[in-house]
């Protein structure tokens, strides 16, 4: 999860990326950093992809990802959960790097008035530019 600044407070971006293709498989923007936010993102990923049998989903050890609810959802989908070592973001470097690129290339160019404006802008960046035009 990464923080997106708006004039009304933070928005929280949850992202699932394919580490092989570097494409964003699913994302969601929330007004709160909750288990429900990361569950919605995972459900979007499942609906958008034909995924192989042996899927490993890697995340940090944030409370959203270590919650019983999230672990049960992963188990329901038959996924293996892999964690970064606590306080060691390098294990999740590809996603951390992508969040940095998103912010430098796009988010910091704007001053979002509200959540909806941030959502529309990030939607355009991911769906119309990053996944379809930007070289990975």
Label each region the model flagged:
Residues 1-136:
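Charged DNA-binding/catalytic regions of mobile-element recombinases
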């Amino acid at each position: 999860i990464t923080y997106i600044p708006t004039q009304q407070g933070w928005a929280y971006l949850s992202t699932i990326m394919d580490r092989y293709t570097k494409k964003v498989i699913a994302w969601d923007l929330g007004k709160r950093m909750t288990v429900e936010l990361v569950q919605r993102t995972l459900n979007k990923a499942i609906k958008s992809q034909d995924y192989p049998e042996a899927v490993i989903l890697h995340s940090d050890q944030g409370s959203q990802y270590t919650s019983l609810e999230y672990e049960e959802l992963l188990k329901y989908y038959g996924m293996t959960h892999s964690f970064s070592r606590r306080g060691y973001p390098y294990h999740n470097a590809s996603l951390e790097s992508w969040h940095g690129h998103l912010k430098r290339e796009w988010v910091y160019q704007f001053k979002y008035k509200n959540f909806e404006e941030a959502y529309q802008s990030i939607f355009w960046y991911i769906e119309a530019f990053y996944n379809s035009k930007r070289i990975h």
